[in-house]
């Protein structure tokens, strides 16, 4: 399960890196960042972080929580992929 959580974190970091890639310099030499995409991806990162923390912190150590946690992490991964896809298609 740690691999799934790590994979979700890597996806968020890759999306954030792509979002923070600077556009080419403008006529005045200034470099501007695509703010809309950055805000969208940052929002996705916040959502997946709180989702994953909820998966790991909400169980209280019960056996049922250990069984449910993999499904929770998969749900978080699915949510972040949907969110990131929404960011790329909304621009």
UniProtKB/Swiss-Prot annotation:
Signal peptide limits: 1-21
Domain of life: Eukaryota
Key words of the record: Developmental protein, Signal
Chain's role: Required for tapetum and pollen development.
Protein name per its UniProtKB record: Anther-specific protein RTS
Species annotation: Oryza sativa subsp. japonica (Rice)
Taxonomic lineage: Eukaryota, Viridiplantae, Streptophyta, Embryophyta, Tracheophyta
Gene: RTS
């Amino acid at each position: 399960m740690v691999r799934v959580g790590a994979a979700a974190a890597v996806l968020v970091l890759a999306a954030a890196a792509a979002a923070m890639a600077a556009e080419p310099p403008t006529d005045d030499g200034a470099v501007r960042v695509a703010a809309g995409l950055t805000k969208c991806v940052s929002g996705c990162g916040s959502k997946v972080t709180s989702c994953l923390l909820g998966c790991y912190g909400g169980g209280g150590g019960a056996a049922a929580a250990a069984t449910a946690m993999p499904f929770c992490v998969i749900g978080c991964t699915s949510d972040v992929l949907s969110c990131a896809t929404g960011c790329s298609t909304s621009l």
